[in-house]
Amino acid sequence: DSPIKAAVDNGDELSSKLIFDAAKEGDFFAPYADMLKAGYGTLAYGDAWNIFDNIVVSENLAKGSTGKLKLQQAPGSKFYGNIFKQLYMVQKEGQYKGYPLRTYVGNNFQGGYSDHFPVYIYIGK
């Protein structure tokens, strides 16, 4: 029985019924739920942040026993989910200052990376 049940970049909001129901049933744990409640996000739209990318893990991985693989908090963080957000990935000026620096806006090349920041987790013993 593998401790990792699902790891996805499903391009779906954390609040979506699919993710919410899976986490609610107790088989899965959505480590980004607390981050969203605290105002963090991977994608900004209409001056509101949302968690658009998710890594969903099994409850076994989230609550692993001593000596087993277990979901870990990042050093210095109170969250189990992490958002990779570096200065070079952030729009530095204009209306979308602080948003992810996009590759394209419409048909115009911006030279950025994506319209959302990537996510990652730590797994250890």
Which ranges hold each PLM region?
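Metal-dependent phosphoester-hydrolase catalytic domains
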Residues: 1-125
